Amino acid sequence: MAAPRPCADGPCCSHPSAAPGVQQTLDEMDFERGIWSAALNGDLGRVKYLIQKAVDPSQPDSAGYTALHYASRNGHYAVCQFLLESGAKCDAQTHGGATALHRASYCGHTDIARLLLSHGSNPRLVDADGMTSLHKAAEKGHVDICSLLLQHSPALKAVRDRKSRLACDLLPGNSDLRDLLAS
């Protein structure tokens, strides 16, 4: 078999001789073309277009993340709202057990956490490390989200992760939050 030749205008990414960093995996190409990239970037128009073309709003990518995970993590409220209204599963879990509520809580997006809870998201779900959304919010010192989660489920204070830590054990030093979680 002959060795691949470069294209007339230089190396092609489909050739083994392509420059490193130019090659993309099929997973990366699927991600960029799929609903996940649109949600990650807050591209509501593209998300709507893909949903209208019968893309499942809860379809996971190769890592188990859904469009709702990406939109929640990046604070794209309108995209989250549209996905939920289009039937996205609010409690879909990644391979590591994270939900969209975990992502919103960790990243400090109170409005999205509130939206997810209003659509029935379960704040008691744990990820592979045994952490709830409260653990994630406490770890980053997000007072408003901790308060919101405790309003929905006061029992979260007593949940220990796989290392036997309570949410209050993960605090970065915020005494107001420590009082809220310890009481």
Curated annotation (Swiss-Prot):
ANK repeats: 30-59, 63-92, 96-125, 129-158
Domain of life: Eukaryota
Gene3D superfamilies (alphabetical): Ankyrin repeat-containing domain
Modified residues (Phosphoserine): S153
Keyword flag Ribonucleoprotein: no
The protein's name in its UniProt record: Ankyrin repeat domain-containing protein 39
Keywords: ANK repeat, Phosphoprotein, Repeat
PROSITE patterns xref list: ANK_REP_REGION (PS50297), ANK_REPEAT (PS50088)
Family: Belongs to the ANKRD39 family.
Keyword Repeat: yes
Pfam family of the protein (one): Ank_4
PANTHER family: ANKYRIN REPEAT DOMAIN-CONTAINING PROTEIN 39-RELATED, BRCA1-ASSOCIATED RING DOMAIN PROTEIN 1
